Amino acid sequence: MPRERAVVSVFDAGFLLGDGVWEGLRVWGGHPAFLERHLDRLFEGAKAIMLDVGRSRRELTEAIYSTLRANDMTDGVHVRLMVTRGVKRTPYQDPRVTIGPATVVIVAEHKEPLPATVTDGITLFTTHVRRAAPDTLDPKLNAHSKLNDIIACIQAYTAGADEALMLDPHGFVAACNSTHFFVVVGADDESEVLTSDGRYCLAGITRANVLEICQANGIPARETTFSLTDVYAAREAFVTGTFAGIVPVRSVDGRTIGDGRRGPMVERLQALYRELVDADVAARIAP
């Protein structure tokens, strides 16, 4: 369907209230990478908010592949899979006023990160907006409502940075507004990769893959709490996400990280991650 005809009702719960869950997928060789993990997260999130997706995992998989085939898309594609609670009879929060099935939208676009971003990296700015606590809006939910992250993003680009670095309610580093954050610390022969303890961030697919890559290749890595002091003193830093994979960080709050260029650990992890993606899509068979 042409994008100008792709519309939803103004009474849709996603439009009215941000009531829904979603996933972003990268496609290579005609296959969505790590599809099972993304569907796991989607269905777990939907169950947590009592949202009936209305389609099976297989039906969603077939719909994704059908969309890719209809648009002749094989490489360099980003897919956004969105599920909302559906159309309501009136603008109101209560899910019981929903009058139809869940709304499912698949947006597939040819979209790739700029090569310079992947090699030269990005800049971060620490915002005053904190990651929410699990008893307010659990950060583990990949919900449509992203206003907390959007406000942080606005603060970051207003300050001249590419993305926001966000702290948890206790002042430790949590994540960025749309990616996960890692630092490389220690001497050359004792380098260690650190990321947050995971309590205040989305259960990132790429984040998990990076930790598994480290374990498989003898690279010390762990989830822990650390502060901005550790960030400013880090040898390297990088962010992870489905769209761009692994991206180096040049500076945080105007403080140069390392020598301000992509470091050897980031370059190594980028290569290992690319191998993992290639292996995953090569093993897939389209339905």
Listing of model-derived features with the role each one plays in the protein:
Residues 1-165, 169, 202, 211-287:
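Conserved alpha/beta cores of soluble small-molecule-handling proteins
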Residues 164-165, 172-198, 203:
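Glycine- and Gly-Pro-enriched alpha-helical subdomains that act as flexible
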Residues 208:
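N-terminal G-site helix/loop of the GST-like fold
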